[in-house]
Amino acid sequence: MNIGVIGSGGREHSLCFKLLQSKKVDKIFCIPGNAGTGEICKNLDIDILEFKKIYLSIKKENIELIIVGPEIPLVQGITDFLEKKILKYLALVKMHLN
């Protein structure tokens, strides 16, 4: 399985590191990633708020699961965008409390 991890911090580096230990993972793409993730997976130089560009890379690289690390793309609606494209993702979601 090809997995995409959105973010460029230590959290995303740790996720990539642990995911690579699974025999079910073929390749990991970090969007945009950092120097550390670049050593263990393929970084894709795309801004985390460029949802359309992220989607095109998901399709091009046959990414089957997206993991969203940072809060900013979540607040800006990346989960809604991914749902509309019928893509699998793992992320915290916004909850409305009354």
Predicted regions and their residues:
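Active-site loop of classical SDR/Rossmann-like NAD(P)-dependent oxidoreductases
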Residues: N98
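ATP-binding N-terminal substructure of ATP-dependent carboxylate-amine bond-forming enzymes
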Residues: M1-M95
